[in-house]
Design a protein with these regions (language model features):
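P-loop NTP-binding core
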Residues: 1-244
Length: 244
């Protein structure tokens, strides 16, 4: 089993869309039993799969009251793909983790799910606190979406530095350009400066994920966006294989 965290300290970089689509590629293309776990109280991952948050707001209970995560898992309409949705109870997750004082709570829970899933994709909130520290401890690979700009390399270095600060024995980190538009000179310059970074294009198909509440591979499998997610997923599987 491998845990893949999609994490950024900055919002609005396509993090949730990337996490939701990677989970689908894991289940549909790699044929792996996959869990998409939404840790962001905004609940975007659930929305992208048409799953509404529970009115009972229990997502935080798996951390605070030792509720089995399996009790809150929803099946999606896609084979091998399940979702553990977020809700407003996660808004105080940082304080909750600080109060219970269990530094590896998330790691232990993902390990407990290893019998059911081969891949767990975490959609993480854009924060630098105990949540991000627990994510780094639990993850086998951290995906960092970045906007294409001349400062992308510096931005990635800062995120990587923070990850190392929280966990010296940190997992591999894979940067990915999100919302890249090759028609823009600055975007081309950023990509040319980092040609080995995977990229997700700025495309209407990506925007349609929220409208259709479906992964792009379902309704636009031949699109540039679907190819971008496929290439990113291939890079992820390669990184995991290299890490052993």
């Amino acid at each position: 089993m491998a845990v893949i965290a999609v994490y950024s300290v900055k919002g609005g970089v396509g993090k949730t869309t990337i996490a939701a689509n990677l989970a689908w590629f894991s289940a549909a293309i790699s044929k792996r039993r996959t869990l998409l776990w939404d840790l962001d109280a905004a609940g975007g991952a659930g929305f992208l799969y048409g799953i509404e948050p529970s009115k009972r707001a229990r997502a935080g209970s798996v951390f605070s009251r030792d509720v089995d995560p399996a009790e809150l898992i929803h099946k999606t309409e896609y084979d091998r793909l399940d979702l553990l949705p977020a809700d407003e109870s996660l808004r105080d997750l940082d304080g909750m983790l600080a109060r219970i004082g269990k530094k590896r709570r998330l790691e232990r829970m993902t390990q407990a799910l290893a019998k059911r899933y081969e891949r767990i994709v975490l959609d993480c909130p854009p924060v630098l606190n105990e949540i991000s520290a627990q994510v780094v401890r639990a993850a086998d690979l951290v995906i960092v979406p970045l906007p294409p700009s001349p400062l992308s390399t510096r931005a990635f270095a800062l995120v990587a530095e923070e990850i190392r600060r929280h966990s010296p024995a940190h997992p591999p980190i894979l940067p990915v350009f999100s919302m890249i538009d090759r028609r823009r000179a600055l975007h081309r310059e950023a990509q040319d400066a980092n040609p080995n970074w995977p990229m997700i294009p700025l495309a209407s198909a990506v925007e349609q994920c929220a409208v259709r509440q479906q992964p792009v591979g379902v309704f636009a499998p031949a699109s540039a966006a679907a190819k971008g997610f496929q290439q990113l997923w291939t890079a992820i599987e390669r990184k995991l294989a290299e890490a052993g």
